[in-house]
Structure formats: structure tokens, C-alpha cells
């Protein structure tokens, strides 16, 4: 359970960071 929660947390942070990057640099897309 702990490992699964850790992986979920890492994935969530990665997705949020990616979305923030896309919103900050929309001209690249």
C-alpha cells in the first residue's frame, strides 16, 4: 500500500508539473 501510494503521489506531481509547463509555454504546442 505504501509503495502504491508513493507511486501515485509521484505520478500526480509529475502530471501537475507537466500541465503547469504546458500552460506556461503554450507557444511550443
Swiss-Prot record:
<dbReference type="Pfam" id="PF09604">
    <property type="entry name" value="Potass_KdpF"/>
</dbReference>
<keyword id="KW-0630">Potassium</keyword>
<keyword id="KW-0812">Transmembrane</keyword>
<keyword id="KW-1003">Cell membrane</keyword>
<keyword id="KW-0813">Transport</keyword>
<keyword id="KW-0633">Potassium transport</keyword>
<keyword id="KW-0472">Membrane</keyword>
<dbReference type="InterPro" id="IPR011726">
    <property type="entry name" value="KdpF"/>
</dbReference>
<keyword id="KW-1133">Transmembrane helix</keyword>
<feature type="transmembrane region" description="Helical">
    <location>
        <begin position="2"/>
        <end position="22"/>
    </location>
</feature>
<comment type="similarity">
    <text>Belongs to the KdpF family.</text>
</comment>
<keyword id="KW-0614">Plasmid</keyword>
<dbReference type="GO" id="GO:0008556">
    <property type="term" value="F:P-type potassium transmembrane transporter activity"/>
</dbReference>
<comment type="function">
    <text>Part of the high-affinity ATP-driven potassium transport (or Kdp) system, which catalyzes the hydrolysis of ATP coupled with the electrogenic transport of potassium into the cytoplasm. This subunit may be involved in stabilization of the complex. The Kdp system is essential for growth under K(+) limitation, and for survival under desiccation and salt crystal inclusion.</text>
</comment>
<protein>
    <recommendedName>
        <fullName>Potassium-transporting ATPase KdpF subunit</fullName>
    </recommendedName>
</protein>
<comment type="subunit">
    <text>The system is composed of three essential subunits: KdpA, KdpB and KdpC. The complex also contains KdpF, a small non-essential subunit.</text>
</comment>
<dbReference type="GO" id="GO:0005886">
    <property type="term" value="C:plasma membrane"/>
</dbReference>
<keyword id="KW-0406">Ion transport</keyword>
